[in-house]
C-alpha cells in the first residue's frame, strides 16, 4: 500500500511539472485556438457561396453578381488557407518549444534513472518520448481536436436549414463518434503490446552494441542474432496487428462519412421535391455536414500518434516524479585534495545489505591508496560512492 501511495505521489509531482511547461506555452496555444476559430468560420464560405449561386445568380442570371461573389470567395479562401497554414506552423513551434524546454530535464532524469533502482526503462526511452509528443503536437490530430468543438455549431446551422437535415447530421455525428471511441478503446491494448515488443527488441540491440567485444569473443553472435530476430518478428507482428485493427476503423469511419454525406444529399433531394427547401440548401447542408464530421474522421486516422503521445506523457510523469530536478548547488571552495571516509556503509541501490561497512580511511594530497579484494567485496561500490554515483 505504501508503495502504491508513493508511486501516485511521484506521478502527481511529474504531472505538475509537465503542466507547468504547458502553461508556459499557453500564449501559443491561445493563438492557435484563435486561428482555429477563424478557419472554421471561413469554412462556411463554400456553403454560403452555393446558397448565393442558387438563390441569386441562377434566378437573376446576373454575370456581374457571379463575378463579385466568386472574387469574394477567392479572397476568403486565400485568407482561410493562410490562417490554416499559420496555425499549423504555430503548433509545430509549440512541439519544438516543448521538446526544447524539456530536453535537458529528460536527459538528466534518464541519466539519473540509469543508475537508480527506480529507473526501469532504457535512458533513451525518455528522449523518444519527447519525440513522440512533439510529433503529435505538430500533427493533424491536435488540430482536429481544436476543430471538434465546432461540430455542434455546424449541426445547429444544419438544423436551421431544416429539422430533418439536422436530425440526420446529428445521428451521423453520433455514429462516427461511437466508431472513433470504439476504435480508440479497441486499439489501445494492441498499441501497448506493439510498444512493449518494440522495446524488447531495442533492449537486445543495446545489449549487443554495449557488449559487442564479449559477444564476439565468447562466440555468442549467432545466439544473439537469433534472439534479436525473434524479438524483431514479435515487434513486427504486434505492429501489423495494431495497424490492421486501426486500419479497419479508419476505413469504416471514412466509408461511413461518405455514405452519410450521400444520405444527406438524398434526404435533401427528397425535401427539394417536396418544395420544403431549395437546391442551394441541399448542397450547402451536405458540405457543412462533411466539414462537421471531418475532425472525427481525422482523429480516427491519428490513433497511433495520439496514443503514443499519451503513453509518452504518462512515462515522463513517472520519470520526472521519481527523478526530481536537481537543485542548484552553491559554489564551494576549491577542494584541497584531502579525502576522508568515516564509517562508510554502501552497497548496490537495489539491495538492503551493504557490501562495505564501517570503512574508514584518509588520503592526503600526494598520497596513494591501493584497494584489493576478491570479486564482489565492494571495490566498485566504493569507487561509485566516492564519485557520487551511489549514495552511502
Residue ranges with predicted function:
Residues 19-27, 115-116, 129-137, 141, ...:
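An intracellular "coupling" helix at the cytosolic face of ABC transporter transmembrane type-1 domains
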Amino acid at each position: 500500500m505504501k508503495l502504491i501511495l508513493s508511486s501516485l505521489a511521484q506521478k502527481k509531482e511529474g504531472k505538475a511539472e509537465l503542466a507547468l511547461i504547458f502553461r508556459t506555452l499557453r500564449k501559443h496555444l491561445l493563438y492557435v485556438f484563435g486561428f482555429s476559430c477563424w478557419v472554421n468560420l471561413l469554412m462556411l464560405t463554400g456553403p454560403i457561396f452555393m446558397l448565393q449561386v442558387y438563390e441569386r445568380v441562377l434566378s437573376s442570371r446576373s454575370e456581374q453578381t457571379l463575378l463579385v461573389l466568386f472574387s469574394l470567395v477567392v479572397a476568403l479562401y486565400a485568407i482561410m488557407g493562410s490562417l490554416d497554414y499559420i496555425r499549423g506552423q504555430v503548433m509545430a513551434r509549440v512541439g519544438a518549444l516543448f521538446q526544447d524546454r524539456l530536453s535537458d530535464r529528460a536527459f538528466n532524469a534518464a541519466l539519473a534513472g540509469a543508475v537508480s533502482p527506480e529507473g526501469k526503462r532504457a535512458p533513451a526511452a525518455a528522449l523518444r518520448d519527447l519525440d513522440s509528443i512533439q510529433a503529435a503536437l505538430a500533427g493533424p490530430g491536435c488540430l482536429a481536436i481544436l476543430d471538434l468543438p465546432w461540430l455542434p455549431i455546424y449541426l445547429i446551422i444544419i438544423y436551421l436549414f431544416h429539422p430533418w437535415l439536422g436530425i440526420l447530421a446529428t445521428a451521423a455525428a453520433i455514429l462516427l463518434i461511437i466508431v472513433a471511441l470504439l476504435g480508440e478503446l479497441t486499439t489501445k491494448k494492441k498499441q501497448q503490446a506493439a510498444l512493449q515488443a518494440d522495446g524488447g527488441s531495442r533492449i537486445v540491440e543495446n545489449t549487443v552494441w554495449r557488449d559487442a567485444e564479449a559477444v564476439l569473443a565468447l562466440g555468442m553472435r549467432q545466439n544473439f542474432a537469433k534472439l534479436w530476430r525473434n524479438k524483431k518478428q514479435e515487434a513486427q507482428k504486434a505492429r501489423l496487428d495494431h495497424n490492421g485493427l486501426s486500419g479497419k476503423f479508419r476505413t469504416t469511419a471514412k466509408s461511413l462519412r461518405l455514405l452519410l454525406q450521400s444520405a444527406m444529399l438524398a434526404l435533401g433531394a427528397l425535401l427539394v421535391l417536396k418544395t420544403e427547401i431549395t437546391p442551394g440548401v441541399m448542397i450547402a447542408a451536405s458540405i457543412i455536414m462533411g466539414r462537421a464530421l471531418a475532425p472525427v474522421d481525422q482523429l480516427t486516422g491519428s490513433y497511433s500518434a495520439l496514443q503514443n503521445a499519451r503513453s509518452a506523457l504518462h512515462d515522463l510523469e513517472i520519470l520526472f516524479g521519481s527523478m526530481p530536478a536537481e537543485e542548484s548547488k552553491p559554489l564551494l571552495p576549491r577542494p584541497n585534495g584531502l579525502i576522508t571516509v568515516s564509517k562508510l556503509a554502501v552497497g548496490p541501490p537495489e539491495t538492503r545489505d551493504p557490501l562495505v561497512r564501517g570503512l574508514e580511511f584518509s588520503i592526503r594530497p600526494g598520497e596513494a591508496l591501493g584497494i584489493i579484494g576478491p570479486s564482489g567485496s565492494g571495490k566498485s561500490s566504493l569507487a561509485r560512492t566516492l564519485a557520487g554515483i551511489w549514495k552511502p
